[in-house]
């Protein structure tokens, strides 16, 4: 099979993975409108082509939280990574490390912090949810600090799980889910051998270490469902800010006022994100939300963005819309499921090449030169002008 883009990895992953796993990573909430808009809105952003600029000294390097990045990309926190490839978090982290970008470990990873951190040279980032069990949160923070994690990514857009209809149909949840998953696994031999048999243990490493017992998929669903905390407020986050002395990033911002609150709170960064369309369907895509947020807080706080990014051109688009760095989620997971560490490494090389093409043809020699001037019509107050015709069409 020829691999030339993330879409090729997606097609391969769909063949390799049991349906319950593929649709868990590929699906979104409700009718998946926001999931689709994330990709489609970003693809509508038009860039200005500029020529004869002498781009021989082009550079993708950037700095974030005093870390040097080979390009303005980090791997996003993705739960259950170790179910998509054998010890998947370790493989993805190694690929990111070799490319000179950060890897973010999810709270609900298969591999625990203590397994992933020693496998790479650069400090990884750690993602934490807002949970009722504050003892677990403190324990996770202590372990992250002990392992040398440099940045905390605090996810705030999951006070309750989203309604993901695909999961019920695919076997991730719903009637007879365990039996359906078993039948799917035995009919996907490549995954069954590589991950199902040789990727054990399939515990949720960070949780089982705290609970003191193995935690499988059913435990994951049950424990998380009982621990999401809808009562959380900015006030409740103060003890985390006091406890964590490294950079802290608030993930799940879609409104300029929430971005301003993050600045007032003292966060070091925000992630403009709708959780990949997996939480509230019908909210703005990240591409639409980003310009107004950048207009409100650019320069006061680091702005990261995710949701809908599938290639290097999308990275350039997000930066032109106001992001400093982007997070890759599904794109790297497709590659991981297909070819493990080598797949992720190849995807990152593709993204780097695609960025270089886009920057060369827009006349941006450095990341700092990718601005709203790189867009065909600049920025509107709420969404890029290049998206305005589409928005009008949707309203008709």
From Swiss-Prot:
Induction: Is induced by aerobic growth on L-lactate, but not by aerobic growth on D-lactate or glycerol or by anaerobic growth on glucose. SUPFAM superfamilies: FMN-linked oxidoreductases (SSF51395). PROSITE patterns: FMN_HYDROXY_ACID_DH_1 (PS00557), FMN_HYDROXY_ACID_DH_2 (PS51349). Optimum pH is 8-9. One of its GO terms (cellular component) is plasma membrane. Its EC number is 1.1.-.-. Is activated by 2-fold in the presence of high concentrations of sodium and potassium ions. Is almost completely inhibited by a high concentration of pyruvate (10 mM). GO terms for molecular function: FMN binding; L-lactate dehydrogenase activity. CDD domains: alpha_hydroxyacid_oxid_FMN. InterPro entries: Aldolase_TIM, Alpha-hydoxy_acid_DH_FMN, FMN-dep_DH, FMN_HAD, FMN_hydac_DH_AS, LldD. Belongs to the FMN-dependent alpha-hydroxy acid dehydrogenase family. This is L-lactate dehydrogenase. It comes from Escherichia coli (strain K12). The lineage of its organism: Bacteria, Pseudomonadati, Pseudomonadota, Gammaproteobacteria, Enterobacterales. The gene is lldD.
